[in-house]
Design a protein with these regions (language model features):
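A glycine/serine/threonine-rich, flexible loop-to-helix segment
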Residues: 43-47, 181, 193-218
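Substrate-binding pocket helix/loop in short-chain dehydrogenase/reductase
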Residues: 104-105, 112-117, 210, 214
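Short, small/polar-rich loop/turn modules that mediate ligand/substrate recognition or access, typified
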Residues: 180, 185, 244-246
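C-terminal substrate-recognition "lid" of short-chain dehydrogenase/reductases
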Residues: 222-251, 256
């Protein structure tokens, strides 16, 4: 049995994945890193080889999983099974989900609704069903699901997106309460106004003038960094915070308050 803690991070080559993996590796975690197998989400990354080498230099054993579809039960079970087969345990799981479609509600299509639901809501359902059983059996574990602060603050032009995110937030909170008695924590972090390629491309924030307008909408008057988001997430994942569960945390610079 592996004595180091083991953490799983999905869609790990982009978004919060690299800085979070570094923090967990440095704090004594081995890692299972899932990489996207298509362009169905807004979280895209790059060649993971340098990151894997960097994590190994920090003392982490790393298992990379690629060819799975996390919109399915089978895909989520596969990444959990890899963790158990390689390391014999799963202590922490961070599930990154996200696809966005904007537009007027009456101009929306059923196909758009089904796409958003499959990534933003169904993926969360499948992830929780796969990760919970081994943690319950071990009597310990931490799960964090990334959603969106938009699920807590409805806005026009993103009704489908906001609805699927709100559903994911509610699911995570209820599942966290239901499984607290087993020593497993389940929490959601909903982000907005984060400085990463997906957000900048969607909002035009790569343009300095447009970015200034966007930042003026945030109470903190700036975009959040992936490094500070990773620090916040690590506290919920690394075993230090075992009395916090069933919560939705908005990480948006005060925007959703």
């Amino acid at each position: 049995m592996n004595e180091r803690r083991v953490a799983l991070i999905t869609l790990s080559s982009g978004y919060v994945g690299p800085p979070l993996a570094r923090l967990l590796a440095a704090s004594g975690h081995d890692l299972v890193m899932h990489l996207p197998n298509d362009a169905s989400t807004m979280v895209q990354g790059s060649d993971p080889t340098p990151l894997v080498d960097e994590l190994a230099a920090l003392g982490a054993a790393v298992e990379v999983v690629g060819d799975v579809d996390l919109r399915t039960s089978e895909g989520n079970q596969a990444v959990v099974d890899v963790a158990l087969a390689r390391f014999g345990r799963l202590d922490a799981a961070c599930f990154v989900t996200g696809s966005i479609i904007t537009g007027k509600f009456l101009g929306s299509t059923l196909a758009q609704w089904e796409k958003l639901k499959s990534v933003n809501l169904d993926m969360v359902f499948h992830a929780l069903q796969a990760a919970l059983p081994p943690m319950i059996a071990a009597g310990r574990g931490q799960i964090v699901v990334f959603t969106s602060a938009t699920g807590a603050r409805p806005e026009p032009m993103v009704s489908l997106y906001g609805a699927t995110r709100a559903g994911a937030n509610a699911l995570v909170r209820a599942v966290g309460l239901e499984h607290a008695k087993f020593g497993v924590t389940v929490n959601a972090i909903g982000t907005n106004y984060m400085d990463f390629p997906g957000f900048r491309q969607a909002t035009g924030a790569d343009d300095p003038e447009r970015r200034a307008v966007i930042e003026s909408q945030v109470p903190m008057r700036r975009l959040g960094s992936m490094e500070e988001l990773a620090e916040f997430t690590a506290v919920l994942l690394d075993g230090r915070s075992r009395f916090q569960t069933g919560q939705f945390f908005s990480y948006s610079g005060g925007w959703s308050t």
